[in-house]
Amino acid sequence: MCIRDSYSSGTTGRPKGVKVPLRDTALGDTDGVTALLGLLFGANQNTVYLSPAPLYHAAPLRFCRGIHKIGGTVIVMPRFDPLELLQSIQRYKATFMQVVPTMFVRLLKLDKTEREAFDVSSLESVVHAAAPCPIPVKKQMIEWWGKIIHEYYAGTEGNGFCYCNSEDWLSHEGTVGKAILGILHIVDDDGAELPVGEIGGVYFESDGNFEYHNDPEKTESAKLNNGWSTLGDIGKIDEDGFLYLTDRKAFMIISGGVNIYPQEAENVLTMHEKVLDVAVFGVPNDDLGEEVKAVVQLINPDQASPEVERELLSYCQEQLAKVKCPRSIDFRDELPRHPTGKLYKRLLRDEYWGDSESRIV
């Protein structure tokens, strides 16, 4: 059997080799990704696609390849930089772009005069994926660039695909979309399906088949006996069928028997005017098992101090229940991020756990 073998980003562990059977189609036939580029995002032979992410990751590679197949133009940036991105949009009159939410955050942290110095009116479609986007961030991007922002939820595994446009999102704030490939299910730890609105593991029912290279245990853990499969995320579905992601299952914190999803605190702290980047995760606590820790990269690293730590903790507690907020904050000059923009949170967690083992991984 012929297969396609790609590697995941490795944000929750070592990068996984994902083996997917090749479709039985002729070489020149339109593949699923190329079809979606036209149907969802309006890509055509006149498209100028700007890629701020490296091409060794599945999504940027497949989007660039798809644009080439339909005759469009691809511009690949050597690396992401917010000012250089705006310069490239203006210089090349880019019409289409795919980003991750961190790139939105970095763009919004620019001074207003810097943001307004560039003409981005050529943009027709901007897609983001790979991580949940804080609601205030997406609102501000739609206000800035207009209702041209799309979102999808999918993985290298190819077992399903959710999508929403700006109109969908504005009427269902926080959603990552409805399933357009596969059927969504939310299940509990025993594999039983949960009703609308309840939080559980996110699974797709589809004909997509995959396995992890040289890791049968990982492959088995991603699938239920009925064939449904998961990318490892936790979330819920509303009454209209829209999916909302809570966090990665591997990042869930269990503190004193309470399940805490660090994405909530990350979304809050990201919006503070002094914060450039943030990671929230569980660290060992003798009494509670785990406690919530934040590691923050400030816009001005010289401001790192106990006073700023107290300011950020207070800011978080004003918007979230105290149990969901960090007990302490450490400051770093830079957080470990994949060149695609994904956060390597596991590297930070490993520093704090040492020889201990998290009870959730």
Regions found by a protein language model. Give the residues of each.
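Conserved AMP-binding A3 loop
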Residues: 4-31
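Beta-strand->loop->alpha-helix junctions that form or flank phosphate-binding loops
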Residues: 149-157, 176-178, 281-284, 330
